[in-house]
Regions:
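Glycine-enriched, solvent-exposed interface loops adjoining structured elements
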Residues: 1-230
């Protein structure tokens, strides 16, 4: 479904009277209002979940004595626990600005086996200062939440033929309750349906781990029995 067909479907379902034949560039109030709703919807959905459709990888090699490395132009946020130094096979641990200052003041240098990172001014900053050329990789969520008709990523709607990068049905459900709210109409039940559908889609649309009875994770404070006796 495209921007135009989603918008028209919402307007027809909610019996909103006028159903425009175009959205982008249309000066009618209904077209401008539904475009605003669609923009808010795709933005909020993209920020609320780590959609697999928006997940990407970025890799780079350090430069000796250089601490900062530019983030991808479409970077929105890190996928947690995916930043690794693939040369040393060690994780790069994210820290808060306060923790960063403490570590920096301690004068940490290479050789400890530990490395830290933070995001600042469009760059990922590493500590300690790299003393060698080493490969790094991390996963991130892209801000290109819309695709053109030729499947080129965009950060917003630019044409009636654009399609959402994430599940179009979820976008339609989410935009429906937002449209009803915009019009001052009851929307609670539609919002509940949309939220539940989004959560279920995220669960179903990505890989999930099978829980095994012998699995152990020190961070999880429960035990798994090795055998089960009926």
């Amino acid at each position: 479904m495209s921007l135009l067909t989603i918008a028209q479907s919402i307007l027809k379902e909610t019996k909103s009277g006028s159903v425009p034949t175009s959205i982008i560039g249309n000066t009618e109030d209904v077209a401008k209002q539904i475009l605003e709703v669609m923009t808010v919807s795709i933005t909020e959905l993209a920020r609320s979940f780590n959609w697999q459709e928006l997940q990407k990888e970025n890799s780079f090699s350090t430069v000796i004595a250089q601490t900062g490395y530019n983030l991808p132009t479409d970077f929105d946020r890190f996928v947690n626990n995916t930043f690794f130094n693939t040369t040393t096979q060690h994780a790069v641990m994210p820290v808060t600005p306060e923790e960063w200052r403490v570590l920096n003041n301690q004068g940490i240098t290479g050789g400890t086996g530990f490395s830290y990172s933070r995001i600042r001014a469009g760059q990922v900053i590493l500590l300690p200062t790299p003393a060698a050329v080493e490969a790094h990789i991390y996963e991130y969520i892209s801000n290109l939440v819309v695709l053109s008709s030729s499947l080129v990523g965009q950060s917003t709607w630019l044409a009636d033929t654009d399609v959402p990068a994430i599940d179009a049905h979820i976008v339609r459900l989410d935009a429906t309750w937002r449209w009803l709210k915009n019009q001052g109409r009851p929307y609670g039940e539609d919002q509940k349906i949309a939220n539940n559908a989004a959560i279920e889609r995220v669960r179903a649309n990505g890989e999930r781990r099978t829980i095994k009875h012998y699995y152990y994770d020190a961070n999880i404070k429960i035990g798994y029995p090795q055998t089960i006796t009926p």
